[in-house]
Amino acid sequence: DGCGLLLRKPDAFLRLAAAEAGIKLSGHYGVGMVFLNRDPALAAAARADLRAELAQEGLTVAGWRVVPINPDACGEESRKTLPHIEQVFVNPPADMLPEAMERHLFVARRRANQRIRARDPVYYVLSLSGRVIDYKGLVMPASLPEFYPDLDDERLESSICLFHQRFSTNTLPQWWLAQPFRYLAHNGEINTIRGNRNWAEARSYTFSSPLLPDMAKIRPLVNMTGSDSSSLDNMLEVLVMGGMDIFRAMRLLIPPAWQNIEHMDPDLRAFYEYNSMHIEPWDGPAGIVLTDGRYAGCVLDRNGLRPARYVITEDRHLTIASEIGVHDYAPEQVIAKGRMKPGEMLAVDVETGRLLTPADIDHDLKSRHPYRRWLRGH
């Protein structure tokens, strides 16, 4: 049912690829992976609409690059629905900060999606960001670098790599439903998905953020018909684009069983109790890996119903997977290894090289505001 890689943007490689395609990039830029219709007229219309929405957000399309692919790496059935795949490179104005560019890319992508997918369901933007890029499709894992020669190019380097192989249980295989999505990959099921989607839709008219002044542009906040994982990714993205960091957003969506942990730190309990008033848990068996391009991490559901094991090596590599042995390390290289516990979150900051343990993350979250006082006062 597909697989993929979500990478921290491999800047050096993408600049070389853009230059080879005659595309001039600014100091910071966005790049999108786009599934287009194989009908040239529909593909051209989609490009034009996406360009128009980007222009509305003050962004300029620097150019399009046809992504090299090898259809022979696909199975017979996946070749029947194989889309045309291109990368779009986007330059911001000189005075637009990278964080602002991310939000403008987000709004433009959402608006273009509303315009295009109603007439062309093949169209899909895998990622459109200045921080990450997503390579995925309906291929077997061993065939992914054969399908995408970019991934077999030694010039492509990244400090974050999220991999997922999908076995769908509630949707039919489709190119766009392969994982990872734009922020996360999910092993499990969201058993509360119908309620989560309905509440997200019902509350969308009360959500507000000064960073997203016109929320109507991005509704619906989550898709109502795709996989549960894709809807969870939608919700996480909305929270992050609205100004919430990835740690608080993820702990709102996938909290631990804080009500039943007898000896939980009172300040940490207050954090979860306060935030539980804003959004319901997206509950069910869940092992999630995620990244925003700076932080990469893993979180387990409150019951720990999906496995997650980690290995840390002396050359400062962190590997988290559902099984030990995904990557072969010599025993003398390993400085720490273990199993994540129910409700825990583990992460790394690749810009500082800091490992963020579950205790580090909890301490940061509980210390941001006087949650206990707020609860007593209200």
Regions picked out by a protein language model, each given a short descriptive name:
Residues 1-378:
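Conserved short alpha-helical segments that host acidic/polar catalytic motifs at enzyme active sites
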